[in-house]
Regions:
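Conserved N-terminal helical subregion
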Residues: 1-5, 22, 49-190, 228-237, ...
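Active-site substrate-recognition segment that forms the wall
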Residues: 196-229, 233, 237, 241-249, ...
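A short coil-to-beta-strand element that immediately follows conserved catalytic motifs
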Residues: 176-179, 194-196, 249-267
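Conserved N-terminal glycine-rich FAD pyrophosphate-binding loop of Rossmann-like flavoproteins
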Residues: 36-52
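Catalytic P-loop NTPase motifs of RecA-like helicase/translocase cores
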Residues: 37-38, 165-166, 292-294
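C-terminal helical "tail/cap" subdomain of flavin- and related membrane-associated enzymes
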Residues: 1-3, 65, 75-77, 81-82, ...
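Conserved mid-domain beta->alpha element of the FAD-binding
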Residues: 6-27, 31-34, 157-158, 240, ...
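Histidine-centered metal-chelating micro-motifs
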Residues: 163-164, 183-185, 205-208, 290-291
């Protein structure tokens, strides 16, 4: 008899989990509260560890074709005037697989690829629908949906983001925590000669430039923002210009052209810090619902797809769903907390606004940045599922 799963949330984690479990023979129902596909970020970049997991899902080649690949893994650091500081290179080999080191892609394109696989795999997708309540027995879950249906399943996944309805129902004390940072993003036409991932540094500010297709790139800037800051959408262009006006060089043209018709997004960055166990009975949280992070390591999407791949592998190896869920938390919690901690540290370092302190940070980065990249990804690989496969659930 086929096992059934209800997945709440059709972001990266939810879509990838639906694909992974459908490929493993599960009957999958995916519900999403939005009535149409909408995306809270114009662009995203995925490093090689995330692309290795997309390969495991069978979607990596389509992702690379839909985005912009940085084939040599180069990340160019510039000062606020656009003068070179140093470069780092990201790895293109994970768990024995050669992958693109860095991929930039529009969120809409990523979801187009994923939704195509959902359709081909026969996943039932219900938009404009969410979970109203959850009841559990020892070996099953029953969920009342907002469309009036009562759905029984073997497993329920809360992949419904930072403000997770599933988490609110079962873990009401776990609330998103404001990080102190805001992220400003904008989409622009890509000049033919701009093919690198660029990070520009100034005291208390970072501004990145990342190609996301042959035709487009996006800017992403981080800055300390007040708690509970809210800005009217019509002010976003002016505010982004004013916050990052110190940046010239390759960023100047893009900042100067911002206006009312620009594609812009402002996000107050929040984290989710769950207890070590991400499940209660047959209900499990994945993705941002369980471990939303600050963006400074660029690992949010990669951690979401890795959740999906690891969960499917664990469930493939046993008929004991409860034991697989316990093992999932044991494997994934340390890796995701490592990413959260590393990202937070990078953010705090970059937020230092004293010019002399900033200069000292840059001096240290010139000699240590590549080693830190290498150490981070080596540790991430050590914490990955492939290094735990000898243990059975």
């Amino acid at each position: 008899m086929k096992r059934a799963v209800l997945i709440c949330g059709a972001g990266i984690a939810g879509c990838c989990a639906a694909i992974a479990l459908a490929r493993s023979g599960w009957t999958v129902t995916l519900v999403e509260k939005q009535t149409a596909w909408r995306f809270q970020s114009s662009g995203i970049f995925v490093y090689g560890n995330g692309l290795a997991r997309f390969h495991a899902l069978g979607v990596m080649e389509e992702m690379v074709a839909a985005g912009f690949a940085i084939a040599d893994g180069r990340n160019v650091y510039l000062d606020a005037d656009g003068s070179p500081l140093f470069e780092t290179f990201y790895p293109g080999r994970f768990d024995g697989l050669e992958v693109t080191p860095i991929l930039g892609i529009r969120r809409a394109e990523m979801h187009r690829v994923l939704s195509g696989h959902l359709s081909r795999l026969g996943v039932e997708v219900a938009l404009g629908c969410t979970v109203q309540s959850i009841e559990q027995s020892r070996s099953a879950v029953s969920a009342v949906l907002s469309d009036g249906r009562v759905l029984a399943c073997d497993l329920l996944l809360g992949a419904d983001g930072i403000r997770s309805r599933v988490r609110q129902l079962l873990w009401p004390d776990v609330q998103p925590r404001y990080s102190g940072f805001g992220v400003w993003r904008s989409v622009h036409d890509r000049p033919a000669g701009l093919g690198d991932k660029i990070m520009m540094m100034a005291p208390g500010l970072r501004l990145g430039i990342m190609p996301i297709s042959a035709q487009q790139l996006y800017l992403f800037g981080t800055v300390v923002e007040p708690v509970d800051a809210w800005y009217a959408r019509e002010d976003w262009a002016r505010l982004m210009q004013s916050r990052f006006s110190v940046f010239r060089g390759p960023a100047a043209h893009f900042l100067d052209e911002l206006g009312p018709q620009s594609e812009l997004l402002y996000t107050a960055v929040e984290e989710v810090l769950m207890p070590a166990a991400w499940h209660q009975g047959r209900v499990l949280l994945i993705g941002d619902a369980a471990h939303a992070s600050t963006p400074f390591m660029g690992q949010g999407g990669a951690m979401a797809v890795e959740d999906a791949v690891v969960l499917a592998r664990l469930l493939d190896r046993t008929t004991d769903i409860d034991r697989a869920l316990e093992r999932f938390s044991t494997v994934r919690s340390p890796a995701c907390r490592f990413v959260q901690d590393a990202s937070r540290q990078v953010g705090v370092s970059g937020a230092r606004s004293d010019p002399q302190e900033h200069a000292g940070i840059l001096d240290a980065m010139r000699t240590t940045a590549q080693a830190r990249v290498d150490e981070f990804y080596a540790r991430l690989e050590q914490l990955g599922f492939d290094h735990h496969q000898e243990e059975t659930p």
